[in-house]
């Protein structure tokens, strides 16, 4: 982060203390800040529903599972949109944008597809029927569709799946052509994880975009899932460099499934600070690249995160805790968005297809930021003893260290000093 990007310091003066993430993101030049929706929680958890439906906080929704193949066509030719409609209906009711996810993916694929005895003609017919029906059902509602998901494995090779075995890489342009025919007006994305590290997997994803383009098929965007680890997230500059590898090909980019998990729990106060800085670097990199259109977190509360089920002993990867309190990560994101709001970057030429009013006029009181638990002083009748408190967490260079509403660290790592920029924002300089 450059000093000058923070020192544009009408900063939060242009964004009052009540400003929320989507509102700030739009002011900063992005199209949206959004969240995934956990279908099973929306009707059973009122607090979850209230925050998710706050259009100043989240301007876009994406279904976590409801539009995947196993949900929409569990048996051949038998379509069920009940789960996918939960998110689509909620977005429409609230006036939020909708990202749609996903069409061609090796996982959550019914056995009748993955184990079928196909040739090119028969599998293409299956793909066409699926894409026509699913995209047809949501036609006109989706800003973008993740057409192909995770086609590259962790070693940077083409992922072995039924589509690759039958078509080779021809299934990639085929998928995008079928999607374009089904809904000509939505944006068509390739979506994957670990592209952020700019290694062999990223190289292969660049090749994928070129394969689709060279075949004359349409591809509009690349989604960076952003499933990252606290302390191992690339820097803001490194992330922006990777984003530009794709925008230079003429496609837009977005962070589509962002979460940053702690590898050890419970997280220390210092780890929470690091997590906040990592989130700020991701969001900041999107602000730094004109072709980056938005950020979506993969659910917003630790209560409904997929991480603990997949990575044992890890988690707390989101911006609200399990009790719906805003974490330091939320504050870090809001700060980096507010810093850019007075001097937003150039935006790309298209807009999210959402109603003109993108956030509500009525406001709700956000849940309080939880206070850190400090061990209490204990004594005995014989010999007084004191439990030593953990060291005060320290903010890194460029990080926020104070201001109205700030509940994070107020001490900077040496040799940096906590410097007042305005009443709302103090920074380690």
UniProtKB/Swiss-Prot annotation:
It is an enzyme of class 3 (hydrolase). It comes from the Eukaryota. SMART domains: fCBD, Glyco_10. InterPro entries: CBD_sf, Cellulose-bd_dom_fun, GH10, GH10_dom, Glycoside_hydrolase_SF. Induction: Induced by xylan and Avicel, and repressed by glucose. Disulfide bonds join 286-292. Keywords: Carbohydrate metabolism, Disulfide bond, Glycosidase, Hydrolase, Polysaccharide degradation, Secreted, Signal, Xylan degradation. This is Endo-1,4-beta-xylanase 1. It is found in: Secreted. It catalyses: Endohydrolysis of (1->4)-beta-D-xylosidic linkages in xylans. GO terms for cellular component: extracellular region. Endo-1,4-beta-xylanase involved in the hydrolysis of xylan, a major structural heterogeneous polysaccharide found in plant biomass representing the second most abundant polysaccharide in the biosphere, after cellulose. It comes from Humicola insolens (Soft-rot fungus). Residues 371-389 have a biased composition (Low complexity).
